[in-house]
Swiss-Prot record:
Belongs to the MnmG family. HAMAP family: MnmG_GidA. It holds the Pfam family GIDA_C_1st. NAD-binding protein involved in the addition of a carboxymethylaminomethyl (cmnm) group at the wobble position (U34) of certain tRNAs, forming tRNA-cmnm(5)s(2)U34. This is tRNA uridine 5-carboxymethylaminomethyl modification enzyme MnmG. Homodimer. Heterotetramer of two MnmE and two MnmG subunits. It comes from Buchnera aphidicola subsp. Schizaphis graminum (strain Sg). InterPro entries: FAD/NAD-bd_sf, GIDA_C_N, MnmG, MnmG-rel, MnmG-rel_CS, MnmG_C, MnmG_C_subdom, MnmG_C_subdom_sf.
Amino acid sequence: MSKSYLKNFDVIVIGGGHAGTEAAAASARVGCKTLLLTQKITDIGVLSCNPAIGGIGKSHLVKEIDALGGLMARAIDYSGIQFRVLNSKKGPAVRSTRAQADRILYCQNIKKLLKKELNLLILETEVKDLIVKNYQVIGVLTQSNMSFYSRSVVLSTGTFLGGKIHIGLESYSAGRKGEKASIDLALRLRDLPFRVDRLKTGTPPRIDINTINFENLFVQHGDVPTPVFSFMGDISNHPLQIPCFLTHTNEKTHEIIRKNLHKSPLYTGIIKGVGPRYCPSIEDKIVRFPDRKSHQIFLEPEGLTSIEIYPNGISTSLPLDVQKEIVSSVKGLEKSKIITPGYAVEYDFFDPKDLNLTLESKWIKGLFLAGQINGTTGYEEAASQGLLAGLNAALSAKDCKQWFPRRDQAYLGVLIDDLTTQGANEPYRMFTSRSEYRLTLREDNADLRLTEIAYKLGLVDNPRWIRYNEKVLNISNEKNRLKKIKIYPKSSDSTILNQLFNIVLTKEINILNLLKRPEITYENLKYLKNFKVGISDLEAAGQIENEIKYEGYIKRQLEEINRHLKNENTPLLPTYDYNKIKGLSHEAVLKLNDYKPVSVGQASRISGITPATISILLIHLKKEYYKNHLS
């Protein structure tokens, strides 16, 4: 696409955060002329809060974004300054990669990836209004009264819609420190048929690294070998790896906080929005867990060249003088200096129950919402929604069928189903525990689950498609090879198994079945004399091992998925008036009319909808079928 001035686009994306960048890139990748509008081009892809990508459940989303051709995994591979696998001693379903990020490098790498998208134009301007005609979005209006027109719009405004920052009892309008909130657009959106509420998030003070005493603090190094996020990535992509440090709050810290709760906007009623349950402020921790003697604080570098340390664990909106007292009471931070105060930010979000599973608004055709505007918290949750919204905005612009993953296909499927079915009364964060199919939704198989779909949708380029097919072939060939290699009871390899792993063979066994034993890994097969490693790709080797070890469990889970798919594939029309279906309880009628589920499966996951309600719906659908087809 020519980068010259244009007014007409296929897709317009509002907001250059994690949701917006993925949305813009996805739309451009599938061939749509795309415009990304952002208040500050320099802040595209910025890590507003913690300088890290991944974590429990979140890393699965990053892997899925990558399998769908997205940006986040590739950007963090080139920006991560410490990589670790969390839950490494647990089963593969809950193992989660986490990377400490260099803030500057991460932004730079996101911008580099966006520059490669030939169908994408980026413009620095603020949007003040949507142009809507007959409940169809047709464009946007900027603060300078410039109009841009499109067939689809993605709204990914983060914390900027009506954003308000709180430090102590003082507050001011802002979407992020040093950046103005989007007030005109927030007011305009409240005039549209959306259900709007407020949420809150927060961030800790930043500390000058040169004023910290690291002696006697616990040092936390990254993993060796260093993990990689992208299926196209390599360890050689990583910059210099550096450690983090661990310290703790103490009784003195807690007493300072208790004495100053009357200065907290959280406890004086100034902040109305609900904060994230799984990332509470230090004030919340002290109030909610009064018996705890200490709380962890991870001292995380913000980059290789940055002098700022992010003290993960003490998010706060107390006044600056109190923040200084809190920090100075902590071991290693006695003489430290705060560079930037912590703060809380309140912002508008829209009820995600008003969205289809494609993230298109039920009320405004062509309008897609992604990220914190949908009630989520976290970069990874935002980015995955952005990719899906951008893809479907592009498909809508092309008059093509839209796509979304099911719960059994991806954590992204779990995320959007939870949001559109349950809504968000508090900021939604992804965990592996949210999925009932987590054994088949592992980090390591995200590409096997999604890349073929992505290729058919136009999201994946040829190099990735070739790499994917090579991996699939290598896994298949190696499994067949392992099946043919046998170990006999009186062989030298049988003796080795007995000596190293206390395994006594009474009959012959092939290597594939040997891998089912918990003590045997693909890596330690190298101790066998008659075995040679047949695959150099460690990721593919791990895939083989996981599939073999958990074969029985995976088989049962797949059978369960097939049983549930019958209900998932039984549609419910959005035009149904549930008042007219006999036998439904008053509560069921209210909830079904409110949520408008798209399938019987989705209806079954609405809080308060009982198995009896589902039976009544199925009977009604059966009667309706016979009425329409046999009359």
